[in-house]
A protein has these predicted regions:
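N-terminal glycine-rich flavin-associated loop
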Residues: 1-20, 38-84, 92, 96-129, ...
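N-terminal accessory segments
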Residues: 1-27, 318-339
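Short beta-strand
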Residues: 22, 198-204, 291-296
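Short active-site-proximal "capping" loops at secondary-structure junctions
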Residues: 25-29, 41-43
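Conserved glycine-rich FAD pyrophosphate-binding loop
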Residues: 39, 242-365
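Short, conserved charged micro-motifs
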Residues: 63-65, 177-184, 226-234, 272-279, ...
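C-terminal substrate-binding/cap subdomain adjacent to the FAD-binding core in PCMH-type
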Residues: 112-262
Length: 365
């Protein structure tokens, strides 16, 4: 299916006023048999290792991108939760990210340009690989994280990074039994002469499941040449005791969420992460099977529970630092996902500009 074919499908749905859900590999959410799938839109269109840029069709999987860039000792520093069977299109449409966002940022920081089909069937290009963007709008950032509610993403251009010579992960011992202990530790880690690629806080439940101990632990992913990594490890060892853990820990964290889980993301200023962490831990202390992990550099706590149950509404009211974002509530009906966090009237006006008949779904898979 080409971009032109996708545009024709969208125009037909727009003429009929028929809702048109968008699907990728359906690894996270299946919008049903009537969805417009871009999973067949696979393949790398252009890869210039010397420029550290790559353009791929939206249905290209993260695994395919990892293989291609790995052969050049490069990588796309997006590690969204789930598996590498997910597509780059869905990753960008949902602005999904993982632990590497600590150092490298989110999709809005890494996506250089897009090709997309708007809700009236128009084909547009934004950002990279074009001479001129639409005046007054950063459409690349607008479409990234819009959950398919503004346009069908058909092609993505991303920024790559060189892979570090050494990539090592350590576990830093954490005391969070005293009210100020975690905050003090995180302050010392931030002040240390180290620049972790990822810095992820794990609650005891997920730490035990992944074989990282039975208490709260802080994982630090260190990268660089051998001398740099040794120096960073020594700096962090001066803060608290450290042990080496396997690199597969990061893949295990990303793949730990079952499809039926509730996933709720809460955020605060990074300096207030310890306070938010304590609030979430206390609120979920009697929630069987619940666990949490936090991306320190983003100030974000990710709460996962196998059975949302009635307690989910309580979680939505205890966010210590900001509005919670519901990524998924298992199979519970009646919940949606706010794709942008924008005021409703502003979001309605934006959607009407790109999808005048309201046919595009705010769901992506």
């Amino acid at each position: 299916m080409s971009t032109q074919t996708i545009a024709e499908r969208v125009r037909e749905a727009s003429a009929r006023g028929t809702r048109l859900p968008i699907a990728g590999a359906r690894t996270w959410f299946d919008p049903g048999p009537d969805a417009l799938s871009v999973a067949a839109e696979r393949g790398i269109v252009e890869y210039t290792p010397g420029d550290l840029t790559l353009t791929a069709r939206a249905g290209t999987t993260l695994a395919e991108l990892a293989r291609a860039t790995g052969a050049e000792r490069q990588w796309l520093t997006l590690d969204p939760h789930g598996t590498d069977a997910g597509t780059i299109g869905a990753t960008v449409a949902t602005a999904s990210w993982g632990p590497l966002a600590h150092a490298f940022g989110t999709p809005r920081d890494l996506v250089l340009g897009l090709e997309a089909v708007t809700g009236d069937g128009a084909i547009i290009r934004t950002g990279g690989r074009v001479v001129k963007n639409v005046a007054g709008f950063d459409l690349t950032r607008l479409f990234t994280g819009s959950w398919g509610s503004l346009a069908v993403i058909t092609e993505v251009t991303v920024r790559l990074r060189a892979r570090p010579e050494v990539d090592e992960t350590i576990a830093i011992a954490v005391r969070d039994d005293a009210p100020d202990a975690l905050g003090a530790l995180l302050a010392k880690v931030r002040a240390a002469s180290a620049a972790p690629l990822a810095l992820e806080l794990l609650s005891p439940a997920i730490a035990a499941r992944l074989g990282a101990g039975a208490s709260t632990v802080l994982l630090a992913r260190l990268g660089g040449n051998a001398e740099s990594v040794r120096a960073q490890r020594a700096a962090l060892a001066a803060v608290s005791s450290v042990t080496t853990v396997g690199d597969d820990m990061w893949r295990a964290i990303r793949g730990s969420e079952a499809a039926e889980s509730a996933v709720i993301r809460l955020s605060a200023r990074p300096s207030r992460l310890a306070e938010l962490w304590r609030t979430v831990r206390e609120a979920t202390s009697h929630w069987s099977g619940a666990y949490a992990h936090a991306t320190v550099g983003r100030g974000v706590v990710r709460l996962v529970a196998p059975d949302p149950g009635p307690g989910v509404t309580d979680i939505l009211t205890v966010a210590g630092g900001g509005m919670p974002i519901v990524e998924r509530l298992g199979s519970l009906p009646g919940f949606g996902v706010d794709p942008g966090g924008a005021p409703p009237e502003l979001w309605r006006r934006i959607r009407s500009a790109f999808d005048p008949h309201g046919i595009l779904s705010s769901e992506a898979a």
